Amino acid sequence: MPGMPAHPGALYTAEQVRDLDRRAIDEFGIPGYQLMTRAGHATLDALRALWPAAKSIAVLCGPGNNGGDGYVVARVARAQGLRTEVFCLDDPRQLSGDARQAHADFVAAGGHCRLWRGEPLDVDVIVDALFGTGLTREISGEAAELLRAANVAQRPIVAVDIPSGLHADSGAVLGVAARAALTVTFIGRKLGFYLGEGPEHVG
């Protein structure tokens, strides 16, 4: 979110955002996977607008719907001719719901994700789709190491909806958080973007 305004207007808690998301699905009949697809396209569009010379990206996909957004980004990026590396934390066959569909469509289009084993992220832009607004616990283990690797890679990071590891309501860092150059957020701006350590991480 480059150039965040001093007076951002309406801000939302994570629960309010989830409620609005449910309303879009239940009351307006928008399929959840359609919302996920829109999010993935919007993220890639914003990335390419800011870094039009980028030829390669790494997409870091987590175990939930944020990871599903990442698989959409990866599928569309491959279709547009970008060299696309996809790293996941867990076996994607354990995904469920819309995220499972996003991964299936990515694989059907010829994509492949692999578990991160400490290799450097040698690409033009990194896409952070590890954890979304539902995260409330501290990040540890391999997920923390992957985020640290992204932060020290000296590559711009594009966060999908929220930088992984940032508490959506308080702006607290939950162990470690992505330091994004750009956050492409959906439905509404989160309180945590403007509180605590949020401004240092959202871009």
List PLM regions with ranges.
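A broad detector of the eukaryotic-type serine/threonine protein kinase catalytic domain
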Residues: 22-25, 29, 111, 131-132, ...
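Nucleotide and nucleotide-moiety/phosphate-recognizing core
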Residues: 44-130, 138-160
